[in-house]
């Protein structure tokens, strides 16, 4: 029993509505009451909202079932088209909240969904539908938003548990069939919260196969803040304590004071004598040092004078030698003459013999 005839008006009899539900859920040809129509496959989030809607307002089940109809064949496989997964989330398209006897038959095939969040009264009224044909689109959009909120609420607990895991664990959890199925059943093709949403708040997460790459935002600023010295903790203010009682001072013996004064004077006299002796020794050492310096100076002066005198005597000797050489030049002439005279005498002696 399909819905080409549209939604019935509010004046439709309740008996006719009950027969319509029986024909949809189990009285159709080739179907048992416990079977669900094969052309209507709901996602886990939509089933969770069906259960939540049935538990919140069971009295409105007949009213919401009045807008039930079978979608065309292109809406039969929402898992193949992730963007169209929210088309079955309307109040009429999800067949409303079935009666308790039909819910018992279909509960064996459903997973136990998490209880959805409590809906405000305004949303409950909007989900009951209206006789106007354009109201179904508004209800479908609202139910799409509700399905997205239910999906985020269902994954918030698991995302908190997985926040402390490593990137490999996150990539394995995000790459599993559960996360892909949840992404396919997203409402209206919108982005749904995944298990890595805490990481996406702190940076950019990209996946390539089984690997998950994470790039932190403002990495230099975070490194600079982590390396900044922390301010020292404030010093704890000490509470004003009661003044401690001063210990009682025993009486002082005057003899002790006199002995102390005498010993102090003796010590002062000894220190003065020591300082005088030290000063005399320093003066003697200073005088000795001055005498040594003067003696060294006199020795250097006398040595310089002696060297100067020796140099002057050498030059004088050289001058005298030159004068002597000049004076001996005539003697050489006389020596030649003497040799000549001697040769002449020898010749004469030879003639005389």
From Swiss-Prot:
It holds the Pfam family BORCS6. Component of the BLOC-one-related complex (BORC) which is composed of BLOC1S1, BLOC1S2, BORCS5, BORCS6, BORCS7, BORCS8, KXD1 and SNAPIN. The modification Phosphoserine is found at residues 130, 166, 197. One of its GO terms (biological process) is lysosome localization. The keyword Membrane applies. PANTHER family: BLOC-1 RELATED COMPLEX SUBUNIT 6, BLOC-1-RELATED COMPLEX SUBUNIT 6. The gene is BORCS6. InterPro entries: BORCS6, BORCS6_C. Residues 23-194, 225-253 are annotated as: Disordered. It is found in: Lysosome membrane. This is BLOC-1-related complex subunit 6. It comes from Bos taurus (Bovine). Residues 102-126 have a biased composition (Basic and acidic residues). Residues 229-253 have a biased composition (Pro residues). It comes from the Eukaryota. Belongs to the BORCS6 family.
């Amino acid at each position: 029993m399909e819905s080409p005839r549209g939604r019935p008006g509010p004046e439709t009899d309740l008996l006719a509505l009950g027969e319509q539900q029986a024909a949809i859920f189990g009285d159709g040809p080739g179907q048992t009451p416990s079977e669900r129509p094969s052309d209507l496959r709901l996602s886990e989030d939509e089933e969770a909202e069906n259960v939540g809607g049935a538990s919140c307002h069971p009295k409105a089940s007949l009213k919401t079932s009045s807008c039930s109809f079978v979608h065309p064949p292109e809406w039969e496989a929402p898992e193949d088209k992730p963007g169209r997964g929210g088309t079955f989330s309307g109040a009429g398209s999800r067949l409303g909240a079935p009666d308790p006897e039909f819910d018992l038959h279909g509960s064996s095939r459903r997973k136990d969904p998490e209880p959805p969040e409590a809906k405000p009264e305004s949303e409950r009224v909007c989900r009951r539908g209206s006789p106007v044909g354009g109201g179904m689109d508004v209800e479908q959009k609202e139910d799409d938003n509700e399905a997205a909120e239910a999906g985020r609420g269902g994954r918030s607990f698991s995302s908190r548990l997985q926040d402390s895991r490593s990137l490999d664990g996150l990539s394995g959890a995000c790459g599993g069939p559960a996360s892909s199925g949840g992404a396919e059943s997203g409402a209206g093709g919108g982005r749904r919260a995944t298990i890595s949403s805490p990481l996406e708040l702190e940076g950019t997460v990209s996946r390539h196969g089984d690997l998950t790459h994470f790039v932190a935002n403002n990495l230099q600023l975070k490194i600079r803040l982590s390396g900044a010295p922390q301010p020292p903790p404030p010093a704890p203010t000490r509470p004003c304590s009661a003044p401690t009682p001063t210990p009682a001072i025993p009486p002082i013996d005057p003899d002790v004071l006199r002995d102390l004064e005498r010993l102090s004077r003796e010590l002062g006299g000894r220190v003065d004598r020591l300082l005088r002796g030290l000063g005399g020794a320093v003066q003697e050492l200073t005088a000795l040092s001055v005498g040594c310096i003067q003696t060294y100076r006199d020795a250097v002066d006398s040595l310089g004078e002696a060297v100067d005198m020796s140099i002057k005597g050498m030059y004088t000797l050289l001058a005298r030698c030159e004068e002597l050489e000049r004076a001996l030049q005539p003697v050489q002439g006389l020596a030649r003459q003497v040799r000549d005279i001697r040769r002449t005498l020898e010749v004469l002696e030879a003639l005389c013999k």
